[in-house]
Swiss-Prot record:
The modification Phosphoserine is found at residues 10, 18, 20-21, 23, 25-26, 29-30, 103, 394. InterPro entries: FAD-linked_oxidoreductase-like (IPR029041), Fadh2_euk (IPR004621), Mehydrof_redctse-like (IPR003171), MTHFR_C (IPR053806). FAD binds at residues 94-95, 127, 157-159, 174-175, 197, 201-204, 210, 217. NAD(+) binds at residues 63-68, 94-95. Belongs to the methylenetetrahydrofolate reductase family. This is Methylenetetrahydrofolate reductase (NADPH). The lineage of its organism: Eukaryota, Metazoa, Chordata, Craniata, Vertebrata. Pathway: One-carbon metabolism; tetrahydrofolate interconversion. Phosphorylation of an N-terminal serine-rich phosphorylation region increases sensitivity to S-adenosylmethionine and inhibition.
Length: 656
């Protein structure tokens, strides 16, 4: 791809097919020594715990289990994203031997934990059991976990298949064997957690014997302990004292189970072989068929237990057994004052917790609303841009062949998407209306609100409210916006709408607008843009690869940056012309993959979406004069006015 000569307002391609998806080499990133904006990104889990304990800052963590279905996997990842907002220190994912836990299936323990780390940015512990497995299998699972970016393992024996425990020849028989093997094979790479049983393991000969086994696990290399659930604070206090007397000094985190239903309580008690206190039974039995009443009681009980634990000074944090539900646990945490939705962001985009991405601090703006897709397409990179985007000539983005990978799939089912986007489209204007309703928040003619688009699976970003009226006006006229940001000139980094990074800094943005529009509008835009050559950078491309840009030598353009005390300037978001050509493949494909395929082939609705896909252009505009008023709206308005201006023949026909 080369620059189109300035002043040429035709849509002849500069170079067709100039960028194609490839993953043959890693991104040539120009690394620098820019200090990390978020210290926790660079810390091991055990170090995060230690720092929190030294400061007295209590934490919470959450346990989940793998779902049984692909749809359940999509829902669980959505739940991860929602519950991440409260600020858990980590989550853990259980190991289900019956569910092929180490496989690449979307319902496997390995894939769910990997997704939490890579695509949800969550510090994650993967449970791993050693019963009924050969040494080679266990070692293979651990190597795979390391490759996927998992750095924390909860080492467990696991439950036997059937009622009787049988030793595995050539395998491990106890959790301590697994701990020793991990330390022997992987050194200090993994942080290791082990289980503690406040009333003793049901298969142990005695409470004292079980404590001895726990001490062996810690001595073998375990970093911290998470306990089985319990119902009374004194049970935990006695356990901690016994551990201390035994010489166990690592953190001991209590496991909390908010009772959420009669049947789930019975099932969990059966599995854990715990006895429910009589006073709890007396309350639950009369209301066992009233789930809401039991849940409310469970919340009250959990809050009371947690208050008692926290007041003791013996508890560094709380670990919640969620049963893959969010309401009860979230409510308990809110009542405890531990659920903290901090609007501050380390960077303007969603982070990944994969160790090799710890230094990453620059991304193209195009994937702002599809961060999981960006992470997927760059997963094979060996290094990630740090300090600046670097050499733009050789980014290698992997192909997005499968739009239905569970962590990239829309959170909304097909039936709901049809209700939002239209069970029947009658014209291009029907599509315009969907974009307008997404921005306005108004229900459509069938009473359904449009809460997502193929390019935006989340509600509108807070900063979009600063542009809402202008966006509504242009979308009504066929400027179908999928990404935008206002110009910002030195707002505090603590600003709740546009702020990011450490406190005490200032953030800046160039105005940015990205949209689909018709060829006719694109041609009018090019004529108008002649007047803005030195101020506005533009790039127009269609699905065939025809493109026109005035980007100087195809260099990346920093559109977001921040200045912070004692640090170099951070520029986390760029408009990169080369990356835009990779993004356009994905952006155009979403018309068909997520919208068009909702309709039958050859149907009028499918034909309309196909026409837009085949004929519209994807455009991005950058206003480089960020201290001045945003000129992009005037550019678009002038283009629309030019487009709607009567031709010479029309004027002659209208003349008297």
């Amino acid at each position: 791809m080369v620059n189109e000569a300035r002043g040429n307002d035709s849509l002849n391609p500069c170079l067709e097919g100039s960028a194609s998806s490839s993953s043959e080499s890693s991104k040539d990133s120009s690394r620098c020594s820019t200090p990390g904006l978020d210290p926790e990104r660079h810390e091991r889990l055990r170090d995060k715990m230690r720092r929190r304990m030294e400061s007295g800052d209590k934490w919470f963590s959450l346990e989940f289990f793998p779902p049984r279905t692909a749809e359940g996997a999509v829902n669980l990842i959505s739940r991860f994203d929602r519950m991440a907002a409260g600020g858990p220190l980590f989550i853990d994912v259980t190991w289900h031997p019956a569910g092929d836990p180490g496989s690449d299936k979307e319902t496997s323990s390995m894939m769910i934990a990997s997704t939490a780390v890579n695509y949800c940015g969550l510090e994650t512990i993967l449970h791993m059991t050693c019963c009924c497995q050969r040494l080679e299998e266990i070692t293979g699972h651990l190597h795979k976990a390391k490759q996927l970016g998992l750095k924390n393992i909860m080492a467990l024996r696991g439950d036997p298949i059937g009622d009787q425990w049988e030793e595995e020849e050539g395998g491990f028989n106890y959790a301590v064997d697994l701990v020793k093997h991990i330390r022997s094979e992987f050194g200090d790479y993994f942080d290791l957690c082990v289980a503690g049983y406040p009333k003793g393991h049901p298969e142990a000969g005695s409470f004292e014997a079980d404590l001895k086994h726990l001490k062996e696990k810690v001595s073998a290399g375990a970093d911290f302990i998470i306990t089985q659930l319990f119902f009374e604070a004194d049970t935990f206090f006695r356990f901690v004292k016994a551990c201390t007397d035994m010489g166990i000094t690592c953190p001991i985190v209590p496991g909390i189970f908010p009772i959420q239903g009669y049947h789930s309580l019975r099932q969990l008690v059966k599995q854990s072989k715990l006895e429910v206190p009589q006073e709890i039974k007396d309350v639950i039995e009369p209301i066992k068929d009233n789930d809401a009443a039991i849940r409310n009681y469970g919340i009250e009980l959990a809050v009371s237990l947690c208050h008692e634990l926290l007041a003791s000074g013996l508890v560094p944090g709380l670990h919640f057994y969620t049963l893959n539900r969010e309401m009860a646990t979230t409510e308990v945490l809110k009542r405890l004052g531990m659920w903290t939705e901090d609007p501050r962001r380390p960077l303007p985009w969603a982070l990944s917790a994969h160790p090799k991405r710890r230094e990453e601090d620059v991304r193209p703006i195009f994937w702002a609303s599809r961060p999981k897709s960006y992470i997927y397409r760059t997963q094979e990179w060996d290094e990630f841009p740090n300090g600046r985007w670097g050499n733009s000539s050789s980014p290698a983005f992997g192909e997005l062949k499968d739009y239905y990978l569970f962590y990239l799939k829309s959170k909304s089912p097909r039936e709901l998407l049809l209700k939002m986007w239209g069970e029947e489209l009658t014209s291009e204007e029907s599509v315009f209306e969907v974009f307008v309703l997404y921005l306005s928040g108004e229900p459509n003619r069938n009473g359904h609100k449009v809460t997502c688009l193929p390019w935006n699976d989340e509600p509108l970003a807070a900063e979009t409210s600063l542009l809402k009226e202008e966006l509504l006006r242009v979308n009504r006229q066929g400027i179908l916006t999928i990404n935008s940001q206002p110009n910002i000139n030195g707002k505090p980094s603590s600003d709740p709408v546009v702020g990011w990074g450490p406190s005490g800094g200032y953030v800046f943005q160039k105005a940015y607008l990205e949209f689909f529009t018709s060829r006719e509008t694109a041609e009018a835009l090019l004529q108008v843009l002649k007047k803005y050559e030195l101020r506005v950078n533009y790039h127009l491309v269609n699905v065939k690869g025809e493109n026109i840009t005035n980007a100087p030598e195809l260099q990346p353009n920093a559109v977001t940056w921040g200045i912070f005390p004692g640090r170099e300037i951070i520029q986390p978001t760029v408009v990169d012309p080369i990356s835009f050509m990779f993004w356009k493949d994905e952006a155009f494909a979403l018309w068909i993959e997520q919208w068009g395929k909702l309709y039958e082939e050859e149907s009028p609705s499918r034909t309309i979406i196909q026409y837009i896909h085949d004929n519209y252009f994807l455009v991005n505009l950058v206003d480089n004069d960020f201290p001045l008023d945003n000129c992009l709206w005037q550019v678009v308005e002038d283009a629309l006015e030019l487009l709607n201006r009567p031709t010479q023949n029309e004027r002659e026909m209208e003349a008297p």
